[in-house]
Amino acid sequence: MKKNIHPQYNVISASCSCGNVIHVRSTLKHNINLDVCDACHPFYTGTQRIIDTRGRVNLFNKRFNKNNKNPFI
Protein backbone atom coordinates (compact mmCIF):
# COMPACT_ATOMS: atom_id res chain seq x y z
CA MET A 1 0.00 0.00 0.00
CA LYS A 2 1.12 3.53 -0.71
CA LYS A 3 2.01 5.71 2.24
CA ASN A 4 1.06 9.37 2.75
CA ILE A 5 -1.66 9.45 0.08
CA HIS A 6 -4.52 10.37 2.40
CA PRO A 7 -5.16 14.01 3.31
CA GLN A 8 -4.44 15.14 6.84
CA TYR A 9 -7.52 15.57 9.05
CA ASN A 10 -7.56 18.73 11.13
CA VAL A 11 -9.87 19.75 13.97
CA ILE A 12 -11.67 22.93 12.88
CA SER A 13 -14.40 25.08 14.43
CA ALA A 14 -17.69 25.56 12.61
CA SER A 15 -19.22 28.77 14.03
CA CYS A 16 -22.93 29.40 13.50
CA SER A 17 -24.55 32.82 13.28
CA CYS A 18 -26.55 31.98 16.44
CA GLY A 19 -23.32 31.62 18.43
CA ASN A 20 -23.13 27.83 18.53
CA VAL A 21 -19.63 26.44 17.89
CA ILE A 22 -19.12 22.88 16.65
CA HIS A 23 -15.71 21.24 16.56
CA VAL A 24 -15.37 18.82 13.65
CA ARG A 25 -12.62 16.97 11.84
CA SER A 26 -12.06 18.02 8.25
CA THR A 27 -9.46 18.23 5.53
CA LEU A 28 -9.86 22.02 5.59
CA LYS A 29 -7.11 24.00 7.25
CA HIS A 30 -9.25 26.93 8.41
CA ASN A 31 -12.41 27.50 10.47
CA ILE A 32 -15.76 27.93 8.73
CA ASN A 33 -18.87 30.05 9.38
CA LEU A 34 -22.36 28.56 9.13
CA ASP A 35 -25.69 30.29 8.52
CA VAL A 36 -27.77 27.71 10.42
CA CYS A 37 -27.03 24.70 12.61
CA ASP A 38 -29.02 22.11 14.55
CA ALA A 39 -29.45 24.55 17.44
CA CYS A 40 -31.21 27.22 15.37
CA HIS A 41 -32.63 25.43 12.29
CA PRO A 42 -36.46 25.51 12.32
CA PHE A 43 -36.72 21.80 11.50
CA TYR A 44 -34.77 20.78 14.59
CA THR A 45 -36.16 23.44 16.95
CA GLY A 46 -39.81 22.85 15.99
CA THR A 47 -40.43 26.48 15.09
CA GLN A 48 -41.25 27.62 11.60
CA ARG A 49 -40.62 31.01 10.10
CA ILE A 50 -41.56 32.30 6.69
CA ILE A 51 -38.85 34.51 5.29
CA ASP A 52 -40.55 36.81 2.82
CA THR A 53 -38.18 37.83 0.05
CA ARG A 54 -39.46 41.00 -1.61
CA GLY A 55 -43.12 40.12 -1.07
CA ARG A 56 -42.95 36.86 -3.00
CA VAL A 57 -45.02 34.94 -0.46
CA ASN A 58 -47.76 37.57 -0.62
CA LEU A 59 -47.62 37.54 -4.42
CA PHE A 60 -47.92 33.75 -4.45
CA ASN A 61 -50.89 33.83 -2.06
CA LYS A 62 -52.52 36.56 -4.13
CA ARG A 63 -52.18 34.60 -7.37
CA PHE A 64 -53.17 31.18 -6.08
CA ASN A 65 -55.80 32.09 -3.51
CA LYS A 66 -58.78 29.71 -3.82
CA ASN A 67 -61.21 32.57 -3.11
CA ASN A 68 -59.84 34.61 -6.00
CA LYS A 69 -62.43 35.01 -8.77
CA ASN A 70 -59.94 35.13 -11.64
CA PRO A 71 -56.96 32.83 -10.95
CA PHE A 72 -55.02 34.07 -13.99
CA ILE A 73 -54.56 37.63 -12.74
UniProtKB/Swiss-Prot annotation:
<keyword id="KW-0689">Ribosomal protein</keyword>
<dbReference type="InterPro" id="IPR042105">
    <property type="entry name" value="Ribosomal_bL31_sf"/>
</dbReference>
<dbReference type="GO" id="GO:0006412">
    <property type="term" value="P:translation"/>
</dbReference>
<feature type="binding site">
    <location>
        <position position="40"/>
    </location>
    <ligand>
        <name>Zn(2+)</name>
    </ligand>
</feature>
<comment type="similarity">
    <text>Belongs to the bacterial ribosomal protein bL31 family. Type A subfamily.</text>
</comment>
<dbReference type="GO" id="GO:0003735">
    <property type="term" value="F:structural constituent of ribosome"/>
</dbReference>
<dbReference type="InterPro" id="IPR027491">
    <property type="entry name" value="Ribosomal_bL31_A"/>
</dbReference>
<keyword id="KW-0862">Zinc</keyword>
<feature type="binding site">
    <location>
        <position position="18"/>
    </location>
    <ligand>
        <name>Zn(2+)</name>
    </ligand>
</feature>
<keyword id="KW-0687">Ribonucleoprotein</keyword>
<protein>
    <recommendedName>
        <fullName>Large ribosomal subunit protein bL31</fullName>
    </recommendedName>
</protein>
<keyword id="KW-0699">rRNA-binding</keyword>
<dbReference type="GO" id="GO:0019843">
    <property type="term" value="F:rRNA binding"/>
</dbReference>
<feature type="binding site">
    <location>
        <position position="37"/>
    </location>
    <ligand>
        <name>Zn(2+)</name>
    </ligand>
</feature>
<keyword id="KW-0694">RNA-binding</keyword>
<comment type="subunit">
    <text>Part of the 50S ribosomal subunit.</text>
</comment>
<dbReference type="InterPro" id="IPR034704">
    <property type="entry name" value="Ribosomal_bL28/bL31-like_sf"/>
</dbReference>
<dbReference type="GO" id="GO:0046872">
    <property type="term" value="F:metal ion binding"/>
</dbReference>
<feature type="binding site">
    <location>
        <position position="16"/>
    </location>
    <ligand>
        <name>Zn(2+)</name>
    </ligand>
</feature>
<keyword id="KW-0479">Metal-binding</keyword>
<dbReference type="GO" id="GO:1990904">
    <property type="term" value="C:ribonucleoprotein complex"/>
</dbReference>
<dbReference type="GO" id="GO:0005840">
    <property type="term" value="C:ribosome"/>
</dbReference>
<dbReference type="InterPro" id="IPR002150">
    <property type="entry name" value="Ribosomal_bL31"/>
</dbReference>
<dbReference type="Pfam" id="PF01197">
    <property type="entry name" value="Ribosomal_L31"/>
</dbReference>
<comment type="function">
    <text>Binds the 23S rRNA.</text>
</comment>
